[in-house]
């Protein structure tokens, strides 16, 4: 199977796992060893400013960025933060995932979020979604997910409550017409 990096996994309406129900997961890494992604539409009850206070990083509460929700990126290592952001170089642990999206895991990006040095657009997730070798491929065969090339507008410009619907609309068909069982139309 080709790499699904820089793609969205869109949870099928029949998804039973409550964590992933109506989830849109951005795939950051996918290779023969497994996959890693961040759910981009599951806000949690903490703002960026509150998170920065909790980890003792100075921040400007008057900035809109301090009021933005943090997201549950997945059930793995929920104490670890990941910042998906528009391209901005200079952070110590950044990787370009596409021409429009970078991921940074270092504290220097967090310190910049409520300043003029912040990336133009960003979301923070706590935790990530991980799949062992062959696990994601099996879930795809089991009809748990739909796949589409990622669109940064869904991550950064679409209101969180509309991200699943917007991703589904990119598929070009009515998802309610799909059979919940693999191999059946």
Curated annotation (Swiss-Prot):
Gene3D superfamilies attached to this UniProt entry: VC0467-like (3.40.1740.10)
InterPro entries: AlgH-like
Domain of life: Bacteria
Any single Gene Ontology cellular-component annotation: cytosol
The family this protein is said to belong to: Belongs to the UPF0301 (AlgH) family.
Protein name, per record: UPF0301 protein PSHAa2600
Species annotation: Pseudoalteromonas translucida (strain TAC 125)
Lineage of the organism: Bacteria, Pseudomonadati, Pseudomonadota, Gammaproteobacteria, Alteromonadales
């Amino acid at each position: 199977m080709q790499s699904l990096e820089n793609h969205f996994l869109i949870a099928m309406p029949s998804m039973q796992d409550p964590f992933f129900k109506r989830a849109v997961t951005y795939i950051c890494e996918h290779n023969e060893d497994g996959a890693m992604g961040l759910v981009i539409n599951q806000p949690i009850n903490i703002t960026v400013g509150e998170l920065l206070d909790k980890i003792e990083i100075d921040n400007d509460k008057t900035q809109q960025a301090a009021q933005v929700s943090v997201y549950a990126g997945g059930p793995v290592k929920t104490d670890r933060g990941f910042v998906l952001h528009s391209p901005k170089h200079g952070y110590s642990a950044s990787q370009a995932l596409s021409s429009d999206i970078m991921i940074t895991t270092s504290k220097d990006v967090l310190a910049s979020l409520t300043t003029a040095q912040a990336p133009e657009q960003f979301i923070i997730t706590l935790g990530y979604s991980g799949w062992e070798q062959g696990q994601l491929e099996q879930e795809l065969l089991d009809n748990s997910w739909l796949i589409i090339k990622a669109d940064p507008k869904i991550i950064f410009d679409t209101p969180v409550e509309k991200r699943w619907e917007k991703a589904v609309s990119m598929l070009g068909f009515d998802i309610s017409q799909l059979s919940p069982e693999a191999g059946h139309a």
